[in-house]
Regions:
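Short, glycine/acidic-enriched loop or turn micro-motifs at the edges of active sites
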Residues: 42-43, 72, 157, 218
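Short, flexible loop segments at the rims of nucleotide/cofactor-binding pockets, characterized by
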Residues: 13-19, 41-43, 67-69, 126-132, ...
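Conserved beta-strand hairpin/beta-sheet module of binuclear metal-dependent hydrolase folds
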Residues: 2-54, 141-152
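Short acidic, glycine/proline-enriched helix-loop-strand junctions
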Residues: 85-88, 220-240
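Active-site neighborhood of phospho(di)ester-bond hydrolases with catalytic His/Asp-centered motifs
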Residues: 38-40, 62-70, 89-94, 150-154, ...
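Metallo-beta-lactamase
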Residues: 6-9, 88-213, 217-224, 232-234
Length: 240
């Protein structure tokens, strides 16, 4: 079952909980003249997610399909969506296009350079290249500048059946999850290198009002401070 929550005006969180691993997989539909779906989900999730989208819009209205980095939970169902929605187009960064998407996708993507913006009607999105943050050479995030929503992928990942939105201690949750992952076969799923702090600081400087996280609760507290605190937590946990 997909849980649907409007976390900001016309910004919808579509959450599928994987009981086997105790983790939410969140996908975001942003309504506008040209609707954007951010995260396609796994290929196996396409039937369930597409049914959830139908509760909000006619799927064929989707114009843009985006994600952070080339990974199955991010864009595994991309070609299923492109087949179902003939007018939809992928949108991704230059590295993602050159390394993976140009070959993988059944239609070519709109390619964005670092800092480039595009509009969907009333909204303007900025692509921010964030190599290896959270992970992947091609990683990037999308910042919706109109309402200041940061679609931040795996940053702040935390486990469990959690509320759709919180203004509580999201960094504490993320730190606990990082520490647990470090004790598992999935250790260092997020790296920390000499550029990580600078990248997280640049995201904090965007002054987002909402962090739309892929795994766990979205956050509407002090987002800039949360990003800076996440840098500290990641550095302390991942560089021991």
């Amino acid at each position: 079952m997909t849980n649907i929550t409007e976390i900001a005006p016309d910004v919808y969180r579509l959450s599928i909980f994987n009981e086997a691993i105790g983790l939410q997989f969140n996908h975001f539909l942003i309504k506008d003249d040209e609707p954007l779906l951010y995260h396609t989900g796994y290929k196996s999730s396409f039937p369930e997610l597409s049914e959830a989208v139908k509760q909000l819009i006619t799927p064929k209205e989707i114009r843009w399909i985006g994600w952070s980095h080339f990974e199955s939970d991010e864009c595994g169902a991309l070609n299923d969506w492109l087949a179902a929605v003939p007018t939809a187009q992928p949108v991704c960064g230059f590295l993602g296009a050159v390394v993976s998407v140009n070959d993988f996708a059944v239609r070519p993507p709109r390619v964005l350079q670092d800092g480039e913006t595009f509009t969907t009607g009333k909204r303007r999105f900025r692509f921010v290249s964030t190599a290896h943050v959270p992970h992947g050479w091609d990683a990037g995030v999308m910042f919706e500048e109109t309402d200041r929503t940061l679609l931040c992928s795996d940053l702040f990942t935390h486990f469990g059946v959690v509320e759709p939105m919180t203004n509580g201690d999201i960094v504490g949750r993320a730190r606990e999850s990082l520490e647990n992952m470090q004790k598992s076969p999935f250790a260092y799923y997020i790296p920390y290198n000499e550029r990580t702090g600078k990248i997280l600081g640049s995201l904090a400087d965007l002054n987002p009002k909402l962090l739309a996280t892929m795994h766990g609760s979205s956050f509407n507290g002090n987002c800039s401070q949360a990003l800076r605190d996440l840098d500290v937590a990641m550095r302390e946990v991942l560089t021991r």
